[in-house]
Amino acid sequence: TIVYFLSNQVYAWHKILLVLTILILAPVFIFASRQPVPSLKTLRFDRPPLVTLSGTLEYIEETQVVWEIPISPKAILFIAHGCHGRASFFWDKSPTCAECSGLPEERTITLNALAKGYVVIAISSTRECWSLSNDRTKVLSILSGWIRDKGLEALPVVALGASSGGSFVSALAREYKFKAIVVMISEGSFHKMEIDENYPSTLFVHMVKDERRATLIKNAMDKLRSKGIETHEVKCYESIVTPDYFTKIPGLDSETSHQIQKIFKENGVLDEDNLMTMDGRAMNWMTPLKKK
């Protein structure tokens, strides 16, 4: 899949959403429904998935900022992490980012974005979760200033936010002229804010078994469409945790992945179909691994 651009550097909306959908379709390691989604092995990478990411860490306005610019950049992706996340989770530890840790799903987003020609910049929230009062002014300043300093003003900017970051991005988009946004695992802030026809195209990514959130997202989509805003959704289903599932983690070989999967099955983390028995956030799934 490639990023399509018009000669005037403005995306066609449906093409933006198509590319962004691919960026966020990493396996969802969480309890959802009985229909599996593609694993990482079925996604096409433009370079090996275990390539080392080399983000550059800076502290701008006393805020952690990590970024990476590919050769011949075509667009800019701003990432807002979820609660308890950090910008440094999206890149591998390297000489230019000693604080980076490269979490598997986060680095997959960065990897795919860079491979598609996106400049990637992530900013950490002031506290554990995002809030407009703490982060709005600072992020607007950092993002605008960084893009200007790097001479990237001609590139279109899109945003991806997860959970708390999704709510934050949806609110920030009223002021910052994103070309499109992705709101993951969140209904956004649409229930408490007004929008007009200039609001960017919006893609919601959510888990089908979270019925309450699905209803809220439907309401948000209806509101956006009533203003003529293009909006779509990606429904995430549970992943089958195969014996090789964990080999996508850099440095983790097939034998270790098989052992982890076996321990999970023996301790009730996975059922007979290799599906998680409950929401991973609600189970102490590290305990059986520590015993070994």
Specify the residue positions occupied by each region the protein language model found.
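Short, surface-exposed "cap/lid" segments of acyl-processing enzymes
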Residues: 71-112
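A domain-start/cap signature at the N-terminus of enzymes
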Residues: 5-8, 15-16, 26-76, 171, ...
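Short, solvent-exposed loop/turn and secondary-structure capping segments
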Residues: 88-92, 132-134, 171-172, 193-195, ...
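The feature captures the conserved acid-bearing segment of alpha/beta-hydrolase catalytic domains
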Residues: 179-277
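Gly/Ala-rich beta-loop-alpha elbow adjacent to hydrolase catalytic centers
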Residues: 160-169
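Conserved alpha/beta-hydrolase
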Residues: 110, 114-129
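Loop/turn elements at helix/coil->beta-strand transitions in domains of secreted/extracellular proteins
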Residues: 73-76, 116-120, 153-156, 176-181, ...
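Alpha/beta-hydrolase active-site loop
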Residues: 127-152, 157
